Amino acid sequence: MTFRSWVVDKDNQDYYGGDQDWFPDEWARRAGCASVCAADMACFYEHKLDISYPDFLELMTKMFKLNTPGIMGFPYFYKFAKNFKKYMKHIGLDVEPIYQKITESPEQGVHLVKTAIDQGHPIGMLILTHEAQILEEETWHCMCITGYE
């Protein structure tokens, strides 16, 4: 299941969500994944399902200021959630994050994802380490999950 999501129109092409490579600043391109995740989630909750590239980049930049990464990136999911909630309240929306620091089993993780998606909520996920080869390039990375198969 995947819910209707936002589309970023950049150079007459549609993109499903943002890309940290769009940041003009090199550091943001390297370490701005939490900012892109937050911008993706904000678009969903604000019902901005079609957004221009300049507007999305502006939102990414706002989120970068809220979630400025340090030398190790931004591996602080409680702080991420607090900052996101604060931003949403500032624009008049109330969200309540649900935290799952560690799952006891893969099945528990799948259940968490499916439940959130089925209830219409995107998931901001931070993967610091993982044993799965398929996720090798995605460690120490934040992403927005909007569906499952």
Language-model features: locations:
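Conserved active-site-adjacent core of cysteine acyl-enzyme catalytic domains
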Residues: T2-V7, M60-E149
